[in-house]
Amino acid sequence: LWAEALGIDPDNLIAGDSSSLNIMFDLISWSYIWGNNDSPRPWKDEETVKWICPVPGYDRHFSITEHFGFEMVQVPMTPTGPDMDAVEELVKDPQVKGMWTVPVFGNPTGVTFAPEVVEKLAAMETAAEDFRIVWDNAYAIHTLTGALPDNPDVIALAEKHGNLNRFWYM
């Protein structure tokens, strides 16, 4: 049911018993302490960890990266999603380890990412091999009309571009 609503392969879906914010905190905490499956070392051993924060954005996201002492780098939101010229420039820096996103009805602006923005996020080259995008799709099925928004399969898109581990999808 959820795989169909989210437009993803059911094999890529795990039903959890925790809030998505707790899961996000745990994933970042794990990467901070031990690294993730693409990390050359734990993030705590990095001189600096930077995180892309589209603004305006969700304050609870920002509190997680603030908790770990990450340098939060602001990127403006546009009517189609984050400013991709800015994002693509920032990810050339190996200290940039991740990015927050709310791709559908983003909090607080209500912006839904355009297909070309989603494609760029899945395909872009990053200097950090362990770069992650938190894909917080909390509002994927929240609509005021009978029509659900498009929910692109970012996992399949990332795999198509050789970036299978790019997204932490919530």
Model-based region annotation:
Residues 1-129, 141-162:
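Conserved core of the PLP fold type I
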Residues 133-134:
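Residue-level marker for buried hydrophobic side chains located in beta-strands
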